[in-house]
């Protein structure tokens, strides 16, 4: 994370919050869910990772860092003093757009102003392996609007992302994290859930597209996933999702081990009729909680809230949002994703 005065102020803020020295006015600037999170004393009995009791992971969809946080003070965004140089004396912010017909033109980053239109609903961009590789252009970084369309140069400010900016200012934001793979959704989610896309093809890969992102897909993967490793190590885990609508964002559905668990539960190949998960299902297969209908309320987190209230939150949890709250351009929006993230934080605090 970039180090500067703003980051120093954030660290000082968190230190003051931990000692109770922060003013009520400063805390009041944050949403209630963030205020409650900041008010919880840190469990730092040993000062090591052993103090971590629960890890809850929510991965949202298809937003670049600069699309959200390019204007946030203190990060390497649009204020970067050393932008990547391009051919012809341009830099990476000056992208040449070559349309299918008509003259080419330079496209600069532009503000998606919600006061001037429905910027929350800007359409999505292509996000598959071929267009990602072409936009990257062997590292030249010069063809983003040509292959990702001109809206790939659009960005939001705090006015559109009030909750996301509050999260970034209250906690840690990393400005140099990148996709595991120049490609689409499922491949990167495979890195998230398994650490690889099987590049050598030893176990069903290499995965470069979304063809295996549902239970009844024609392709099958056979390498070991993180949940399986946790299971072997005796670490409790669970995937919280609504199986009829997880926006096909759970890549575990592509693995034979999880499909076998689905079949043992008596479900059809596609998971239907999507029976509500119960702990008794684990006697059939512990992996069913990776592809079962663990949030039958439509994905609105009631099962997560119930587990927390009962003291049964697993040591490691993944949450997969339904399409409307996935933050993916098109079916979702920044404000809908913010609401969902806030609900997760509300449940945890």
Predicted ranges, named:
Residues 2-349:
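N-terminal pro-sequences and low-complexity stem/linker regions of secreted or lumenal proteins
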């Amino acid at each position: 994370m970039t180090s500067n005065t703003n980051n120093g102020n954030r660290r000082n803020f968190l230190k003051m919050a931990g000692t109770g020295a922060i003013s009520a006015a400063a805390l009041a600037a944050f949403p209630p869910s963030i205020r409650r999170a900041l008010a919880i004393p840190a469990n730092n009995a040993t000062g090591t990772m052993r103090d971590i009791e629960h890890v809850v992971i929510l991965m949202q969809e298809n937003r670049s860092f600069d699309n959200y946080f390019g204007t946030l003070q203190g990060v390497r965004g649009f204020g970067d003093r050393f932008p990547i140089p391009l051919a012809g004396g341009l830099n990476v912010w000056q992208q040449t757009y070559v349309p299918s017909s008509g003259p080419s033109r330079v496209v600069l980053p532009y503000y998606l102003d919600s006061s001037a239109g429905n910027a929350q609903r800007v359409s999505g961009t292509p996000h598959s392996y071929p267009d990602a590789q072409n936009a990257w252009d062997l590292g030249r970084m010069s063809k983003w609007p040509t292959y990702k369309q001109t809206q790939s140069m659009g960005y939001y400010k705090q006015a559109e992302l009030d909750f996301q900016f509050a999260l970034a200012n209250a906690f840690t934001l990393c400005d140099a994290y990148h996709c595991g793979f120049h490609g689409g959704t499922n491949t990167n989610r495979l890195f998230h859930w398994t650490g690889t896309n099987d590049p050598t093809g030893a176990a069903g890969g290499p995965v470069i597209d979304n063809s295996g992102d549902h239970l009844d897909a024609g392709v099958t993967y056979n390498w070991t996933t993180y949940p399986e490793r946790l299971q072997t190590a005796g670490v409790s885990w669970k995937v919280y999702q609504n199986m009829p609508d997880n926006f096909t964002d759970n890549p575990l559905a592509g693995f034979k081990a999880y499909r076998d668990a689905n079949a043992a539960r008596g479900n059809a190949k596609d998971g239907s009729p999507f029976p509500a998960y119960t702990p008794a299902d684990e006697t059939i297969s512990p992996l069913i909680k990776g592809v079962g209908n663990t949030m039958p309320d439509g994905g609105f987190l009631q099962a997560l809230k119930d587990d927390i209230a009962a003291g049964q939150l697993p040591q490691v949890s993944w949450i997969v949002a339904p399409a409307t709250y996935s933050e993916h351009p098109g079916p979702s929006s920044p404000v809908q994703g913010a609401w969902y993230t806030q609900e997760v934080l509300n449940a945890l605090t």
